């Protein structure tokens, strides 16, 4: 007698973990904004991007799309018990500040905001300048 599909196929059911604190990684590029929420060890709890929440093309690079993506990721992470986060910002896109504001307004306590934008110490040669 099989009780449900999970027992039938031998698939483990996803357990809801209680994680009180975590790290939010916001990658704001010129084309998109990606928000990843991890536990302190680096295991991903939830993620969202402007493309995942339904925006496409040039609308993905807007600040409002970053706000919606941050709210979506925060809501999914708060369902697993997340309350306090540290924020790491990477990149120079339009959604940097608006993503942090959305995290605060969604109910997460932001303890630290760090800028982790990679800056080369004169490493690789950049692409040629765009002439429009």
From Swiss-Prot:
Function: Located on the platform of the 30S subunit, it bridges several disparate RNA helices of the 16S rRNA. Forms part of the Shine-Dalgarno cleft in the 70S ribosome.
Keywords carried by this UniProt record: Ribonucleoprotein, Ribosomal protein, RNA-binding, rRNA-binding
Pfam families: Ribosomal_S11
A GO cellular component entry from the record: cytosolic small ribosomal subunit
Molecular-function GO term, any one: rRNA binding
Gene responsible for this protein: rpsK
Subunit record text: Part of the 30S ribosomal subunit. Interacts with proteins S7 and S18. Binds to IF-3.
InterPro entries for this protein: Ribosomal_uS11, Ribosomal_uS11_bac-type, Ribosomal_uS11_CS, Ribosomal_uS11_sf
Upper classification of the organism: Bacteria, Pseudomonadati, Chlamydiota, Chlamydiia, Chlamydiales
GO BP of this protein: translation
Family (UniProt): Belongs to the universal ribosomal protein uS11 family.
PANTHER family named among the record's database cross-references: 40S RIBOSOMAL PROTEIN S14/30S RIBOSOMAL PROTEIN S11
Disulfide bonds: none
Protein name as catalogued: Small ribosomal subunit protein uS11
Presence of keyword Cytoplasm: no
């Amino acid at each position: 007698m099989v009780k449900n599909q999970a027992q039938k196929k031998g698939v483990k059911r996803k357990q809801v973990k209680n994680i009180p604190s975590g790290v939010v990684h916001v990658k704001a590029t010129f084309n998109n904004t990606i928000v990843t929420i991890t536990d302190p060890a680096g295991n991903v709890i939830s993620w969202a991007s402007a493309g995942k929440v339904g925006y496409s093309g040039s609308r993905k690079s807007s600040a409002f799309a970053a706000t919606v993506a941050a709210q979506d990721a925060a809501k999914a992470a708060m369902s697993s018990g997340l309350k306090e986060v540290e924020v790491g910002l990477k990149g120079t896109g339009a959604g940097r500040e608006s993503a942090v504001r959305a995290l605060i307004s969604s109910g997460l306590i932001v303890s630290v905001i760090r800028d982790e934008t990679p800056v080369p110490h004169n490493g690789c040669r950049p692409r040629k300048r765009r002439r429009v």
